[in-house]
Amino acid sequence: MRRIPEPFRIKMVEPIKQTTGAERRAALEAAGWNPFLLLAEDVYIDLLTDSGTGAMSDRQWAGIMMGDEAYAGSRNFVELERAVREIFGYQHVMPTHQGRGAEQILFPELVKRCQGKAPVFISNYHFDTTKAHVELAGARAINLLTPKALDTTAPYAWKGDFDLPRLSDTIETLGDDNVAGIIITVTCNSAGGQPVSMANMEAVAELARRHHIPVVIDAARFAENAWFIKERDPAYAKCSIKEIVRQMFALGDIFTMSAKKDGLVNIGGLCCFKEDLELFRAVQVRCVAMEGFVTYGGLAGRDMAALAIGLREGMDEEYLTYRISQVAYLGERLAEAGIPIQTPTGGHAVFVDAKKLLPHIPAEQFPAHALACELYLEGGVRGVEIGSLLLGRDPATGKQEAADFELLRLTIPRRVYTRDHMDYVADCLIAVKARASDIRGLTFDYEPPLLRHFTARLKPV
């Protein structure tokens, strides 16, 4: 992969501090062996998430100083609406406080429209909050990821794709009336930040149209997905990122977005509709009740100003090349040391295959979460589990489900860390690998009923 140096100058820095091994153990025990509950000041390199943790540009900060905090009709909303229409081609724009805000106001309305008695949403892979909001809306989440993604060693280019034969069979089996929507997650986070090909998106959209099912694009990492299409599909090699984005979104009816990823902001989301004014108005009612007035949706005007700028900056090809090559570099360091990862590396994170690194820990003892804890103990690096802990229990039986993947996600914030930081992370994980056979699994001390991985407290087995 072509590598370029950081395509920016650093104008402001924030000190970070190293801690001792004893301090880290005390902090992790106080947090109930859950990295989510650690204090940020006790973390040296924070790879928990790329959501809202990036650095904004000087132009975005200038936009913040021009914030129009009018309750209704803010100038910054008009700027954001203009940016969305220009970039995505969707006419009806609704800001939300973040991506889950869009999900909580959209999904109940799609379920209401569903004519069947057993509504479902089908996705390549629902992320955690998406699945939670599907279930809160009274529906069931079905994941139909390509089986090629399950082999983390296979160098398949499009591991975020839908399994198209299973998608067709599932719709036929359940019936059109029971499918409230098809959600295309780009990139596919839970599979390793893996891209969805344009051909796969086109096939999904065609199938949905044939069955009169709305297509929802979960657009958190839309620009990274477009970059992969340009890089890996010869048919799009000469297209601009903007052109690819327009073609991707022409295949959807609605998109939700956590703008805290490719929108390059610290807070914000979007719920946008290509042309369905009736649905847009129904969702607006929920927005006013749950998010805020329809021209701010829980955001300050200054945040909308930063987002309007960030959406454009996030599609810059030079920036995206730097961004994705930084992820690839960390992946290469780990792979060279014999640490199993999801290959090829995705757009926003390196995903370590804990099932292979810690084969002695069963799924119900959460091997990827145990690995996350050990990485923190080793060097103060905070990652996050994407596996059975996140997946949760079967809502019908209450039994722990075994996830398809047991992955440690090392999520790289945008425009924050340098190559030296990546080398430090790699060195820490290599040290953990040397004692992998000594790592123990974890069990619950406290288990919340929903989205348990955020606030659960655990203890070593």
Curated annotation (Swiss-Prot):
InterPro entries: ArAA_b-elim_lyase/Thr_aldolase (IPR001597), Beta-eliminating_lyase (IPR011166), PyrdxlP-dep_Trfase (IPR015424), PyrdxlP-dep_Trfase_major (IPR015421), PyrdxlP-dep_Trfase_small (IPR015422), TNase (IPR013440). Keywords: Lyase, Pyridoxal phosphate, Tryptophan catabolism. The keyword Zinc does not apply. Gene3D superfamilies: Aspartate Aminotransferase, domain 1, Type I PLP-dependent aspartate aminotransferase-like (Major domain). Its cofactor is pyridoxal 5'-phosphate. Pfam families: Beta_elim_lyase (PF01212). GO terms for molecular function: tryptophanase activity. It catalyses: L-tryptophan + H2O = indole + pyruvate + NH4(+). It is an enzyme of class 4 (lyase). Belongs to the beta-eliminating lyase family. HAMAP family: Tryptophanase. This is Tryptophanase.
